Curated annotation (Swiss-Prot):
UniProt record, GO biological process: translation
Superkingdom of source: Bacteria
Gene designation per UniProt: rpmJ
Keyword line: Ribonucleoprotein, Ribosomal protein
Similarity field: Belongs to the bacterial ribosomal protein bL36 family.
Organism the protein comes from: Levilactobacillus brevis (strain ATCC 367 / BCRC 12310 / CIP 105137 / JCM 1170 / LMG 11437 / NCIMB 947 / NCTC 947) (Lactobacillus brevis)
Phylogenetic placement of the source organism: Bacteria, Bacillati, Bacillota, Bacilli, Lactobacillales
GO cellular component: cytoplasm; ribonucleoprotein complex; ribosome
Protein name listed in UniProt: Large ribosomal subunit protein bL36
Pfam family, one: Ribosomal_L36
GO MF annotation list: structural constituent of ribosome
Length: 39
């Protein structure tokens, strides 16, 4: 899980979602693409 100031989809499988007020990226193909916005 990467924590970044700005999250962007890295491939066509990445989905941008919102959980508990945080913007996150989840990826079915590559788990390395998981990201979360904020500190």
């Amino acid at each position: 899980m990467k924590v970044r100031p700005s999250v962007k989809p890295m491939c066509e499988h990445c989905k941008v979602i919102k959980r508990k007020g945080r913007v996150m990226v989840i990826c079915s193909a590559n788990p390395k693409h998981k990201q979360r916005q904020g500190k």
